[in-house]
């Protein structure tokens, strides 16, 4: 079998067909290679994975290093803290993904913030006119200061975390905090659409002039929430 066998007999021989045909032809002459086991004895984390307080501090530090605005609070303070962030931002409209706990936004709604539930029909243009979005997350990685969303309850479509200019994300600690990426992957469903967020959207030109908000939210605020009465909260 030659590359030409994979090209439409009556169609033009364009570069795409030519390249794919050559690849198929080359693979056809290659003997099947047995799958080899991968070594799994590598270091999976550079910090103790069993120290929740240390992981929380590391996550806080790395999130802030990426220029996210990080806040800590107890669970019973969460509605008030979310309302405070939205009011301080001047937000009058906020997108609410399906499955977000209703109690999180009761204080904001009482302050006159309009809640826009997302049923999947909000267009990018409509989302661009919204002031803020509030979401939960699937987990957060302490070593890299990364938050992972997987479109689960309270997280919404990927579009929600990319279009609004202000993203408030809630991370439940310690249960949603892992030490490293290798420890995060087994907890994630590989077939779900994942969005990995390390700080607000930013890019730099050739002279390293940083511009934020080009590919996503200009402002990322993260609330690290600990169960009421827990000791791992340092007010911020």
Where in this protein do the model-derived segments appear?
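The feature marks the mature, well-folded catalytic cores of soluble enzymes
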Residues: 2-236
